[in-house]
């Protein structure tokens, strides 16, 4: 007998909740914000909208389904199951945060603050939850399959991300490494920089886009479902032993970007989740082969 679907509601602690937890009471939090020229009512109203959205989406889950909730900070300890339907209630970045822990489960994104969030990944309003949840397993329902980026270390540690993967020193200080493209005639360059970003078309709406735009890059950014990645070296430093000729490019199909670590304390993390970083000691390969996640 197959298990009934389980709706996993993914949410994030609101700014209001964080403020009250830090300062102890609503009044103390209000005083703290007031001393910085802010009004707590604006923060509290966003909190109330988020809680209302979460309650509305939760109430729309079919009665025959199981359901549970997980906060963003607990994602790395949560065990997702094959029959799960992941329901993200919050900001676009929350979809990217949860994607790395999934293996083909469908994801629905609901925007708690339309107009404030771009709505690239949380495209739906809570009022549409009942209809969307009922149609998840209906044959013919349109689904967007998004490309992901994968990094594999020489010790077989693997990291997958929906937006981008960053390699660099803890604290974003100078990172030293050798960078090269597999199958590019053996061209390898020693570099010192503040890190390397490799991202997808989904990531092209966030951190990756800011680097691309600031440089006025001629590279065409990929679409979210396109099997192509783009990469950028941040602030490469020219010196007698380090170069700046390989600072951006694209990875198409099975193309691989290879980095060999030459300084201590380098880490790699995905989608801004620094707390889930992997420490590197030797080599790292970037590829877009993780698109089937």
What is each residue range found by the language model?
Residues 243-282:
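A conserved acidic, glycine/proline-rich C-terminal tail/linker
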Residues 113-194:
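Catalytic core of DAGKc-family lipid kinases
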Residues 188-239:
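Gly/Ser/Thr-rich active-site loops/lids in small-molecule metabolic enzymes
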Residues 286-291:
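Conserved small/polar residues in nucleotide/adenosyl-binding loops
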Residues 95, 113-118, 238-239:
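Short gly/pro/ser/thr-enriched loop/turn and capping motifs at secondary-structure boundaries
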Residues 94-98, 205-208:
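Short glycine/serine/threonine-rich phosphate/pyrophosphate-binding segments
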